[in-house]
Amino acid sequence: MTPMRKTNPLAKLINHSFIDLPTPSNISTWWNFGSLLGACLILQITTGLFLAMHYSPDASTAFSSIAHITRDVNYGWTIRYLHANGASMFFICLFLHIGRGLYYGSFLHQETWNIGIILLLTTMAAAFMGYVLPWGQMSFWGATVITNLLSAIPYIGTDLVQWVWGGYSVDSPTLTRFFTFHFILPFIITALTTLHLLFLHETGSNNPLGIPSHSDKITFHPYYTIKDILGLFLFLLTLMTLTLFSPDLLGDPDNYTLANPLSTPPHIKPEWYFLFAYAILRSVPNKLGGVLALLLSILILAMIPILHMSKQQSMMFRPLSQLLYWFLIADLFTLTWIGGQPVSYPFITIGQVASVLYFTTILFLMPITSLIENKMLKWT
């Protein structure tokens, strides 16, 4: 008798995606992060839903409603810190997922890659809006500084900023619309994730060797479900350790002070996962140039399939490209560190050098290195 999972239309859909899915037999732990991102999304939607039940999206009550959630709501502090640290874990998994895609050449599945870039941008938008909601000092000034960047757009910039703010400054209307978008975006992310999976299953997963694996595939269940569950346990262990022992480790102390439009914090900075892009933004003296550099720091990912010059998909057997790849990772760590430092010498210079190296490595050094490696293949 045919199992129901192969006959029922809905069960068949789940079966083809998570049970009988043909998967390369040699994919490593680096392929775990896709499922972890799914777990992060479920966690964020669940905790966010409970927080939204008690949150008040108004400038006069937002800060006190967060204090109320933390102090008075049953396990409110747990839900709040799971949500805040869950966002950090989300971005850690996201960066590792993109890093794996770059290393093993998964970007050659272009539709999947491009939807992934849209997912990254949407997630960044959701996280930024979420950071504004507690209405602390860093929330308020972060919102003011980042939304003010829209004024760099010629002709329509100023009108656009006032339209986003809902007035002449960041206030209650801004908070209300940010809360609205922050609530709806995770559901848009879920829809985009479904599309991402749909296109991925059209081509099948890549593998560490970067070669076709049609002749050597195994079913996703039980082999990779067990592997993913192990990854999920390690993820939850890390998240719970962070939440229960150091919940404010990745946050900013300034956000425990009520937003005050008359007092600017000594150093305005976003959450740690945006610091690399913030450092690139600050490295350009011109406002419009900085905004363009900020956008390009993410959108440059869309150019990577075009810049791929190697005859091999994966970097597994390309030592020179591997060297450049790890140089790029080190450069991103440097940018993240610089983004959290004050705007003074020598941090400005280091940030500018790191920003130039970031774009130079991706646009010029990596394609040239790939061409050199192609030549080296002929010599062997």
UniProtKB/Swiss-Prot annotation:
Spans through the membrane: 33-53, 77-98, 113-133, 178-198, 226-246, 288-308, 320-340, 347-367
Gene Ontology molecular function, alphabetical: metal ion binding; ubiquinol-cytochrome-c reductase activity
Assembly and interaction partners: The cytochrome bc1 complex contains 11 subunits: 3 respiratory subunits (MT-CYB, CYC1 and UQCRFS1), 2 core proteins (UQCRC1 and UQCRC2) and 6 low-molecular weight proteins (UQCRH/QCR6, UQCRB/QCR7, UQCRQ/QCR8, UQCR10/QCR9, UQCR11/QCR10 and a cleavage product of UQCRFS1). This cytochrome bc1 complex then forms a dimer.
Membrane topology category: Multi-pass membrane protein
Family from the record: Belongs to the cytochrome b family.
InterPro entries: Cyt_b/b6_C, Cyt_b/b6_C_sf, Cyt_b/b6_N, Cytb/b6-like_sf, Cytochrome_b, Cytochrome_b_C_euk/bac, Cytochrome_b_N_euk/bac, Di-haem_cyt_TM
Native source organism of the sequence: Gorilla gorilla gorilla
Cofactor: record remark: Binds 2 heme b groups non-covalently.
GO cellular component, one term: mitochondrial inner membrane
CDD domains xref list: cytochrome_b_C, Cytochrome_b_N
Example GO biological process: mitochondrial electron transport, ubiquinol to cytochrome c
Protein's UniProt keywords contain Oxidoreductase: no
Cofactor(s) it depends on: heme b
Note in the entry: Heme 1 (or BL or b562) is low-potential and absorbs at about 562 nm, and heme 2 (or BH or b566) is high-potential and absorbs at about 566 nm.
Free-text function comment from the UniProt entry: Component of the ubiquinol-cytochrome c reductase complex (complex III or cytochrome b-c1 complex) that is part of the mitochondrial respiratory chain. The b-c1 complex mediates electron transfer from ubiquinol to cytochrome c. Contributes to the generation of a proton gradient across the mitochondrial membrane that is then used for ATP synthesis.
PANTHER family documented for this protein: CYTOCHROME B
Annotated residues for binding of a ubiquinone: 201
Protein name stated in the entry: Cytochrome b
Keyword Iron on entry: yes
Annotated residues for binding of heme b b562: 83, 182
Residues reported to bind heme b b566: 97, 196
Subcellular location: Mitochondrion inner membrane
Pfam families: Cytochrom_B_C, Cytochrome_B
Keywords for the protein's UniProt record, in alphabetical order: Electron transport, Heme, Iron, Membrane, Metal-binding, Mitochondrion, Mitochondrion inner membrane, Respiratory chain, Transmembrane, Transmembrane helix, Transport, Ubiquinone
Main subcellular localisation: mitochondrion
